[in-house]
UniProtKB/Swiss-Prot annotation:
Keyword Translocase on entry: no
Species of the source: Equine herpesvirus 1 (strain HVS25A)
Primary location: virion
Family: Belongs to the herpesviridae UL25 family.
Subunit structure: Heterodimerizes with packaging protein 45. Interacts with major capsid protein 42 and triplex capsid protein 22, essentially at the pentamer vertices. May interact with large tegument protein 24.
Lineage, highest ranks first: Viruses, Duplodnaviria, Heunggongvirae, Peploviricota, Herviviricetes
Protein name from the UniProt record: Virion-packaging protein UL25 homolog
Function: Plays a role at the late stage in the encapsidation of viral DNA, assuring correct genome cleavage and presumably stabilizing capsids that contain full-lengtht viral genomes. Located on the external vertices of the T=16 icosahedric capsid, may bind together the tegument and the capsid through interaction with large tegument protein 24.
């Protein structure tokens, strides 16, 4: 059984003498919200005015 349980930055952190774990949870990540249209951005799509061929 774990020696102690505490919360790191609002997420659950469980620890004992041999191992420790932070259960997977969205609160474990410090990052801005991921944009919903990320994959439709110009880096990942072909522009309609791009000419093909060589």
């Amino acid at each position: 059984m774990a020696e102690y349980v505490n919360y790191v930055l609002g997420s659950l952190y469980v620890s004992d003498t041999a191992t420790s774990t932070i259960p997977t949870d969205v609160r474990n990540f410090i990052a801005p919200p991921f944009p919903l249209n990320f994959w439709s951005g110009p880096t990942f799509t072909v522009s309609s005015n791009t000419e093909g061929g060589s």
